[in-house]
Amino acid sequence: VSLVAGVIFSLIIKIELYESGNRIISSDNLNFYNIDITLHGLIMIFFVLMPGLFGGLGNYLIPIYVGSPEIIFPRLNNCSVVFTSLSLVIMLLALLTEYSIGPGWTVYPPLSLYPVNTTVLVIVGLVVSGLGTLITSINYVLTAFHTLILADLFVPAMVITSIMLIFTLPVLTGALLLIISDMYFNTIFWKGIINGNSGDPVLYQHLFWFFGQTSLWPVYTVKYIMYDAVCWNFMLEYSINIIISCI
């Protein structure tokens, strides 16, 4: 469902930019294009790549590699699936709100400081999605902890990714919640000095990309799996050298 939604948003962007002028987006709601870009980026990263590569492959392959019938907390892992599905619904509800500003998938201030329902729904969806990812990361670390040294390259890569997510997700969540605080509680965490405030919107960028680099690790992990499996079978003696060269 997430992949289909992301592809549809991508097609809308491509059709709209095919030539100059309005094509499929109404001139009465031009801000829909900004909302489209926001939701396309967030859905493809947080609801397609990370659940598919990190959640799907991890839940399937980590128990196989460590010789376990299941991950250590399977019921808790079901909660992460529920949180991810709920966050996707919250994200898609942003399409049904009033005409408003799309802050982009990075949710940078000051664009994200306008007190509109679209931005709030996007932020709440990200926070709920982060909670599901945090639960999955804890599950992975505890499942593979005792057999980490004996496992193949895939398991340490997933565990390292999980540890990075455990440390960086609370930072991103705090930065996003401070945006809501600025919008509705008159705080000045991210309100810049241009408006006479003492906030620091650049600090938000540092906090966001502190997590943003970690979110790319599930993509790298899949490369580790493919290179490790192929090179180990065909080039046993020089496999690690080939893997590093490919990466």
Residue ranges and their predicted role:
Residues V1-I247:
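Membrane-embedded and interfacial regions of multi-pass energy-transducing membrane proteins
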